[in-house]
Amino acid sequence: MEEKNYEVNKKYDEKILINILKNFDKTGEYVVEPGRNEIKKFEIYIENNLKKGNEKKKKNNNIENTETKKMVNVKKFKQKDFIINFFYKFKGSKAKRSYEYAKKLLEYKIRTPEPIAYFDDFVNENNKKNSYYISEELKYDFTCREVFWPEDIERDKAEQGENYKISEETERMLAKVEKNREKIIRQFAKFSFDLHENGVEFEDYSPGNVLIKDKSGNYEFYLVDLNRMKFGVKLNLDKRMKNVSRMMEDEKIARIFANEYAKYCKQREDLVFRYLRHYIRKHKGYVYFKDITRPVRNVFKKKK
């Protein structure tokens, strides 16, 4: 019996989702432009999608269209070569892992956009096979990048000078983050501690992969880009600080994080900070090495 290569959340209509995939290249709005992977958002109708509990809505003609619509994100994974696809047969494709890991996170009450479906080896109208992961589009306020990397914003201002322009909405958001930075960092430290206590090791725990909602000063953290995760892992302090070290670089910010994390893990603050600083510096060195060797690596890629 052939293994099923897709799964759809029971709340959603499979036919609607398949139609989106068939027309992926021609419709939808880009969230992430084509590159290694690409993400588009699509609008679907909830009343056509829910199988139960919608009878009352159908009777009410005054319901606005916005109440019956839902935005979803569809991530299309880049095609892999034969060898990688062979290994995916055993550990699951990135699309499948994203879907299954999202469900598992929700079981742990760890926030992530609602998983809707995954499809492996889906053949589109151009007769090309790709894998897709579909999830709800999350309306968030900012990411960990704005919280932990304020120096990036200052660098952009310096480099662009008079050409530096951002919307009023973005300016208000950055001002709010600046005002509440320490509070957000401390709440994120508690979130990270809970993640580790649940035995979850998010291997891509980086600033762009944590979306944040501001609920009147209480911050909700959502994990995205989930295909590299481990569950049921016993994490000592060394592994925990290594896990979060890609999230930050500024030592003042790291000290705030370490101070708060130490309260929950019942370890000395200086010890937590020492582990964290060690891995921050190690990762910084790794990034620097990659940057200076990039031209050489690009030459070899071209030869291939």
Model-derived segments and their meaning:
Residues 18-142, 158-166, 197:
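Conserved ATP-binding subdomain of kinase catalytic cores across diverse folds
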